[in-house]
């Protein structure tokens, strides 16, 4: 199998072209490009609002995409929300669940290795609600300080919002253990899987996270596509 042949960009670049910036954004796979072309060429219509054939086809393909994403992370289709990016997915959690459920003296825990897209929304929520934003420190080797995490995990901690894999160092956080300890404390957990989703198999039922976000552009799909997974009981409530 020639992997380069699956990415059309290599056909227009010189033969020595090598791409090393996939941590920032991935090249687009031929299947993603061809599917977008198929939609725009064959059934470019609004979804969920019409009964004429191409609209029904567009709706079917849209919901089929949702089913495939759900299957990919082992969730229910009803637990998948499409957004424009992982960043928008985090914002949606922060400004819906966060503003509705957090109050003065509640605590949000994030780590010092977070991407700014998982910092700024919680800073805003803390300012609006009076809750407290605390940071889990990072050790000299770049790994999460798990002893400090456990000491910070008080009864006031209502949410942990944590990156799965660092976009800077590639460090993979032990999210299963963190989620287990959080749930024992009555704390919800949001996982930013934007960096890890292309490299690590993620089963949301197994890891038992409450929310999970990722984006298409870091897994060979188009820009402007993101995913928010949320446990159904939380989505229904918020």
Map each language-model feature to its residues:
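Pyridoxal 5′-phosphate
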Residues: 1-238
């Amino acid at each position: 199998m020639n992997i380069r042949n699956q990415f059309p960009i290599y056909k227009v670049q010189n033969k020595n072209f090598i791409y090393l910036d996939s941590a920032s954004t991935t090249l687009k796979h031929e299947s993603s490009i061809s599917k977008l072309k198929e939609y725009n060429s064959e059934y470019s219509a609004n979804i969920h609002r019409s009964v004429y054939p191409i609209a029904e086809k567009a709706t079917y393909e849209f919901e089929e995409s949702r089913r495939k994403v759900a299957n990919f992370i082992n969730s229910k289709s009803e637990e998948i929300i499409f957004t424009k990016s992982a960043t928008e997915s985090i914002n949606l959690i922060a400004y819906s669940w966060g503003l509705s459920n957090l109050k003065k003296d509640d605590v949000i825990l994030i780590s010092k290795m977070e991407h700014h897209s998982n910092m700024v929304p919680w800073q805003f929520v803390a300012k609006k609600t009076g809750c407290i934003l605390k940071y889990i420190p990072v050790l000299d080797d770049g790994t999460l300080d798990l002893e400090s995490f456990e000491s910070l995990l008080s009864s006031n901690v209502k949410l942990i919002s944590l990156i799965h894999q660092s976009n800077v160092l590639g460090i993979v956080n032990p999210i299963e253990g963190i989620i287990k300890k959080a749930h024992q404390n009555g704390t919800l957990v949001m996982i930013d899987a934007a960096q890890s989703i292309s490299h690590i198999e993620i089963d949301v039922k197994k890891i038992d996270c409450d929310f999970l976000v990722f984006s298409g552009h870091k897994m060979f799909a188009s820009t402007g596509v993101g995913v928010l997974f949320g446990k159904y009981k939380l989505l229904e409530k918020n």
